[in-house]
Amino acid sequence: EAMQAGAHYVGGLDPTIVDGAMEKSLDTMFQIALDYDKGVDIHLHETSPAGVAAVNYMVETVEKTPQLKGKLTISHAFALATLNEQQVDTLAGRMATQQITIASTVPIGTLHMPLKQLRDKGVEVITGTDSVIDHWSPYGLGDMLEKANLYAQLYIRPNELNLSRALFLAT
């Protein structure tokens, strides 16, 4: 119904925890996107092995379905913070080839997202907030410059050139 009303993306949320059927949930989401020639934006908060399995399944689906290339955004993707450097490199190469985007809130805390590593491997990394009143975190301001600042503090060696490069995240 939303697609017929003009939505540009079909979305989803934590296919294993919320839906209890990861493959069925993702297959349905991708099929709707294919039926309407639209993009996919899934909010994946799962950090368990189920989150890694969901990321791998989505990448494999895009690899097998050329019409989905450049049309998948994985928001949050916290499962990537559970991978080692070599695993991130391998997955990032596949994601870059398929033009898969990672949208991050640049979280701080126990999870350290490999955002710089993903970007260095050619993955498009963008930022956002869940809303101005962030229901997931009391620290949400809805300020993209604040996200670029946080990214710079976490991932960039401080010099003028490198700091100016952090603005990609806010623009």
Regions found by a protein language model. Name each.
Residues 60-72, 116-171:
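His/Asp/Glu-enriched, well-ordered alpha-helical/loop segment
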Residues 101-102, 171:
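Structured catalytic/translocation cores of nucleotide/phosphate-coupled proteins
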